[in-house]
A protein has these predicted regions:
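Catalytic cores of RNA-modifying enzymes
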Residues: 1-127, 136, 140, 145-161
C-alpha cells in the first residue's frame, strides 16, 4: 500500500480527529483508493532524485505516495485548516516535505525554490507537478513548466464512476 490514508475509513478518521469535513465549496475530494495512487505514481515515473510540486495535498494521501518515490515534495494548499493535518500525517517525511499555504494560482517560482531549499534532501533530478482535483485543469498555476520551475507536469483529474 502506497498510503495508509487511501481508504474511506482512514480518511474519515483523520478528518474527524481534526474536527474537519469535506469543503465542497473548495472543490475538495479525497483520494481513497490505493490503486489510483499507484497509477498516478506509475505515470509520473518518479525516482529519489525528483522534486515534486503538488497542488492541493488535502490530508496527505497522495503526498505520502509521492514521498515514498521522490526526493522532495512541496505542496501548495489554500485551505487554512489543513496544515495542522499535514503536519501530523506527514511527520515521518518532515525533512523532505515543505508546505506553501496559499492559492496555487498566486504561486511564484521563487516560493517553490525557497520551499525546496528548506528540505534536507538535495535533488538533481527533474521536477514534477501533481495538480489536485480542486483546481480547474484549464486554469494556470503561477509556477509552470514554461518557467523552468518544473520540467514535467502531471495532472490528476477527477475520477468518477
Amino acid at each position: 500500500m502506497l498510503s495508509p490514508l487511501a481508504t474511506p475509513a482512514a480518511t474519515r478518521d483523520v478528518l474527524e480527529e481534526h474536527g474537519l469535513s469535506t469543503k465542497h465549496a473548495l472543490g475538495q475530494n479525497f483520494l481513497v483508493n490505493d490503486a489510483i495512487l499507484q497509477k498516478i505514481v506509475e505515470l509520473a515515473q518518479l525516482d529519489a532524485s525528483d522534486d515534486v510540486l503538488e497542488v492541493g495535498p488535502g490530508i496527505g494521501t497522495l503526498t505520502i505516495a509521492l514521498l515514498k518515490c521522490a526526493g522532495r515534495v512541496v505542496s501548495v494548499e489554500r485551505d487554512a485548516d489543513l496544515p495542522a493535518v499535514l503536519e501530523d500525517t506527514l511527520d515521518p517525511w518532515a525533512d523532505r516535505f515543505a508546505l506553501i499555504s496559499k492559492d496555487a494560482l498566486e504561486l511564484t517560482e521563487e516560493e517553490v525554490h525557497l520551499a525546496l531549499a528548506k528540505c534536507a534532501v538535495s535533488s538533481e533530478g527533474e521536477g514534477r507537478a501533481s495538480r489536485a482535483v480542486p483546481h480547474d485543469a484549464n486554469s494556470p498555476v503561477g509556477c509552470s513548466p514554461k518557467q523552468d520551475c518544473l520540467s514535467t507536469t502531471m495532472l490528476r483529474r477527477t475520477l468518477s464512476d
